[in-house]
Amino acid sequence: MGPAVLVADDIQITVDRRLIATGNVEAFQGQTRLTAQAIAYNPDTGRMTLTGPITIEDGTGVRLLADQAELSRDMQNGLLLGARLVLNEQLQLAAVQASRVNGRYTQLYKTVVTSCTICADDPRPPLWQIRAKRVVYDEQGQQIYFDHAQLRIRSVPVFYWPRLRVPDQKQTRVTGVLLPEIRSDSRLGTGFKLPYFIALNPHRDLTLTPYLSNNTRTLEFRYREKFVRGEIIFEGAVSKDELLPDDTRGYLFAGGWFDVKRDFRLQFDVELVSDDAYLSDYDYSDRDRLDSQIQISRARRDEFIRLSYINLKSLRDDEDDNVLPSNVIEALYEKRLFPSALGGELRLAAEAHAHDRPSSVDFDQNGDGVVDGRDMLRLNVEAEWLRTFQIGGLQAQTRLGIVGGVYEVTDDATSPEDESELSPTAALILRYPMVKQGGDGARHILEPFAQLAWIGGDTLTTPNEESTRVEFDQGNFLSLSRFPAPDRRERGWSAAIGATWSRIDPDSWSLSVTGGQILRQDAQPDFTSSSGLSGTQSDFLLSGQLRLKGGLALTGRTLFDDSFDVTKAELRGNWSNQRLNVGGSYIWIDEDPAIEQFDDIGEIKFDGIYRIDRNWTVGLDMRYDIVAGRTATAEAGLIYQNECVRVGVRVKRSFADSTTLEPSTSLGLTVSLNGFSMNTGERVEARSCGKHTK
């Protein structure tokens, strides 16, 4: 350590070479700073005698206070009376006496530990405290060790530990117990979760969570590992319960990615479950379909490559995995070129797709309108040339291309086995943007646009497997074909007419509205009524985005039919400020028997968090089924947090009712003592003395 610097009102050196400093004494050595009322230094013993109030700070958030002390010259060893150790300006450890050992350990005897604010004018004990015969703080290891520790709420003893070790608040990765949770569920009973975190090394960790209740014995787990060029995570659970007493139940979700050679990225996602109801019974997920996937891809400025395999599993009552496309293989290659001879941009694409159903029945045995065992393979290629011209204020874009495909169908006695196509495409897009600066500083943009498009060839007779559900929105308004996959294409002449108006003002409010309609020479038979694209005249599309300076953002999309009735509507919104964060959505879709949607779909979803004051926060999450006229799920939470404790209560009600799912209610309670690493709540400003919390 470097030389020490001493500052005081009065400094004297006695005849026996002792140094005595009095009045506002400050001593500095390295990062360590000491203040006291008086210091007497004996050079023969190398010891300092200090008179308080004494404060020692090491520059890392550790502060030691005392009434009297005797320390070594480097302040790394010594004895302190009436000591109080403060960690990170939050956790306080008060003791009759303390000793410092080698600048690393601070041993405190007959200790009281709390992070609650203690006021001289408030005679009540702190909300919580840990009393211990001895406490050792390892500053280097960032650990706190307790001997014969007793947890008290106010002055009432609650728990006792012969030995206890907890990390301090600066420690972010340390083996130990995390926040426990008391959980009550209408189906699983009342139970207790106690997570235990194991730091295997700086790059790997494992969390094991025993969950014990009246009706279940469950072990939850999570494993994470980071690599130089990737990461993996596995999470799941294994259960023996009274719901299915003869079965061992469980689930596994795994995912990860790795950067490999030549800019390729390998990604995987595995989703497995023992039975259809397990995820819902234990509130692990609300998914009703699982998709496990592995893919390798590369994205560059003018090139994209992807190869993937997907395995699908349904958890729905009305779906049978044997007649669903359970295995899907896809390969995609896209390339952009900019030929100087032609000008503009040349886009090339090739795609291969194959899916199969486990069933080998080559007809519709279950009567759902789809052949039970149908398998399909297709190969598609596409080449398109695009060029944009500017004629005054008019922007014109031309698109010329050709598309081809080969299709093979097996295990289907009702369809041809092979089919192919080679079709030309062409389009002309016109835009005329107009800009005006308003007197209020806002900028107004009006852009009418129109597209005339044509795709040759005839509609395929192969089954429509991938394009049964079509969305019509602003994103595909000017597409040549609005089917989601190449197994179907729009044919013949079509025209798209619309306009966009925008008001842009970052200091006030901004709004963008787009409206338009598609007109066709011939109706497309594979567009159903819910797509909004059936017939020779599509539904009218109206979409918009609104953003206010105060934090409100709205996005909406609506389709109107010829009678100006709404056939599909979607509205999403979010509003956030310092105290409030609210999000919600509304969706409505008319019935469409052609895609086995025999009822209207209507839903309202709301989630929000409101901070009542600096201590109280309330949250609500709800999903309401408009058609059924009932709530689908509802969840509410309440959090109380001050400088020393965080208490969270959560209640959730699921109204699902089917052969595998039953309505259930769950209640969860978590309690966290602030000041330790296992606390995950945000820091709350300590209350001021003189304002007692009731």
Predicted regions and their residues:
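Outer-membrane beta-barrel proteins and related beta-barrel translocases across Gram-negative bacteria
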Residues: V62-L79, L85-T117, P123-I130, Y137-K694
